[in-house]
Structures are given as C-alpha cells and as structure tokens.
C-alpha cells in the first residue's frame, strides 16, 4: 500500500465514523458546517450519509484556500462552499446543529457562537500512537501524543472514538511521501531524516481520536 493509499485508508475510516456520528447526532433537517473542509472529502460523505438516512440537511464547508474549494465544489454540488477563516465563520448566531472540525484550528468562541443550544461539534485529532514507528526512527526520544478530555466553557464533553490501523510501506519513495505529509518534516533533526531515508520499508501505526462535544442548553 503506497503512501497515498495508506493515508486514504485512514481517511476512509474517519469518514465512516464521521458519517455515523453525523446521523446519530442530528435531527431531520440539520444545518451542518464543516470547518476547514479542504477538498470536501468528509463534507460530501457526511452530506450523502445524512440524505441516505432520510434527512434533509443544509450543509456548508469553509476553508481559507480558494483553489482547494474549487475541488471541493466538484465533490458534492448540493453543498455550499465559502472562503472563510475559522475565527470568522460565515454563519449566524445559534444557526448550526453540527460543526465538524477535522485537523483544523479550534476556534472555540466561534463554535460557541454559531452552534445552537444542544448542538454538537466533532473534533478530530491525531491519536496517542499516531505514526509511532516513524517517530521512533526520527527521534532519539519520541513522544506519545497527549490524549485528554479537555473541558471547554459552554460545552459538555460527550464521547471519544478511537481509530487505529497499521500501514505497510514497501518503497522508500512512499516512506518519504508519508513523511512529507506530516508536521515532522519541518522540525526533525538532520540525523533523523537521514535514518528515515535509509529505510526500504516501514510498518507504521495510524491513530485518530474523534471527540464529541455538546453545547450547553
């Protein structure tokens, strides 16, 4: 499985969980906002899952990149997309039933503003052991990602779901491609990068945590 396919596997798992949660957490006609939607992969999947569940969603996705949003618009023509910042969401006060935040800035005050009382936001972050085997190669003293149930003012913590798998990279180019998709490529010591470049294959865990919060009524 190459780096793109391996990353895609994690994306599929995340989308399945996000779709299931969206159906569970919303009513018959939910207003849904995907913050930092990127190319719209999750946005389109969630919209279709809601429709297949017999709901009539109104859905929008925002991102700061106009070129990326052009790609997103091709994913699902019934979703509205707009260029906007996480810190200035183009939504009215108390107008959103469900907000998705997948690896995007946590603008908690804006989330609290746009969500209706009893509405939910889903927050996706790297799991405790995400890319652990790669980090063991890159660093002399690798660290485990901190996983915690963080309280946010005005919200009730509902649940957490863990997604884990192992990816198998059998080509040095795929290892480097995966490394280039991570923040580690900007802050790894030269010695660690050189060690990674010498690898011909790598089995590496991927792990994601999906946190659910409810706005207090």
What is each model feature region?
Residues 65:
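Conserved SAM/SAH-binding beta-strand->alpha-helix loop
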Residues 39-54:
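Conserved SAM-binding loop of SAM-dependent methyltransferases across substrates and taxa
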Residues 118-126:
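Conserved beta-strand signature within the Rossmann-like core of class I S-adenosyl-L-methionine
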Residues 87-98:
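A short acidic, Gly/Pro-enriched loop at the edge of an enzyme's catalytic core
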Residues 29-38:
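Conserved class I S-adenosyl-L-methionine
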Residues 2-13:
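Single conserved hydrophobic/aromatic residue that forms the stacking wall/gate
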Residues 77-89:
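Conserved SAM-binding strand-loop segment of SAM-dependent methyltransferases
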Residues 163-217:
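Conserved Class I S-adenosyl-L-methionine
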């Amino acid at each position: 499985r190459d780096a793109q396919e391996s990353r895609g596997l994690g994306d599929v798992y995340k989308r399945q969980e996000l779709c299931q949660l969206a159906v569970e957490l919303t009513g018959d006609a939910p207003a849904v906002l995907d913050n930092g939607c990127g190319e719209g992969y999750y946005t389109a999947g969630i919209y279709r899952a809601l429709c297949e569940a017999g709901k009539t969603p109104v859905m929008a996705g925002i991102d700061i990149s106009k070129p990326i949003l052009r790609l997103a618009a091709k994913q699902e023509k019934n979703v509205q997309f707009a260029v906007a910042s996480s810190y200035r969401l183009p939504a009215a006060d108390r107008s959103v039933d469900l907000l998705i935040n997948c690896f995007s800035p946590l603008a908690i005050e804006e989330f609290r503003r746009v969500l209706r009382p009893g509405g939910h936001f889903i927050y996706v972050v790297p799991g405790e052991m995400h890319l652990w085997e790669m980090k063991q190669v890159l660093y002399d003293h690798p660290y485990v990602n901190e996983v915690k149930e963080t309280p946010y003012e005005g919200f009730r913590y509902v649940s957490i779901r863990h997604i884990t798998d192992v990816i198998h990279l059998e080509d040095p180019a795929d290892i480097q491609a995966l490394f280039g998709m991570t923040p580690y490529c900007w802050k790894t010591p030269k010695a660690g990068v050189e060690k990674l470049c010498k690898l011909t294959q790598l089995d590496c865990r991927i792990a994601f945590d999906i946190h659910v919060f409810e706005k207090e009524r």
